[in-house]
A protein has these predicted regions:
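Short amphipathic alpha-helix with an adjacent loop that forms part of the alpha/beta core around
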Residues: 4-14
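Short acidic, glycine/proline-enriched helix-loop-strand junctions
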Residues: 14, 57, 61-72
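Cytosolic regulatory regions of ion transport systems
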Residues: 25-29
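A short, charged, Gly/Pro-tolerant segment at domain boundaries
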Residues: 75, 98-110
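ADP-ribose/adenylate-binding Rossmann-like module
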Residues: 17, 33-59
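Active-site capping/gating segments
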Residues: 48, 67-97
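Short, well-ordered coil/turn residues at beta-beta hairpins
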Residues: 20-22
Length: 110
């Protein structure tokens, strides 16, 4: 709940990208509810669909619809095949850069 309270004071506009990196943190569903009511451009939660699913269910019970819930990206990052923390961070950063430029991301044709 603390994260949700703090997010209320953050100016979130249509260029804001928010990434939740701890899918086990208390209050994630409440924080996501705050963000989904905003015009944030990108909302991501690190973790598998299995980990994030309970938050989606909780948000649905709070009245959020499919269109709202589709804004939540999870798992995060591009599929670069990496497993180390550095590689995962790179894949998330690359995904955010691709989003910045409205690109699907992939190899450039030669």
């Amino acid at each position: 709940m603390r994260v949700a309270r703090e997010l209320v004071d953050v100016e979130i506009d249509d260029e804001t990208r928010l990434v939740f990196t701890d899918h086990d943190a208390p209050g994630i569903a409440d924080a996501l509810a705050v963000v989904l009511r905003s015009p944030a451009r990108f909302v991501g939660v690190m973790g598998s669909r299995r980990h994030v699913g309970p938050y989606v269910d909780e948000l649905r019970a709070k009245g959020f619809g499919d269109e709202d819930l589709a804004r939540i990206r999870s798992p995060l990052g591009l599929d670069l095949g990496g497993r180390s923390p550095a590689e995962i961070a790179l894949s998330i950063a690359a995904g955010l850069v691709a989003d910045e430029h409205d690109r699907a991301a992939g190899w450039l044709d030669r």
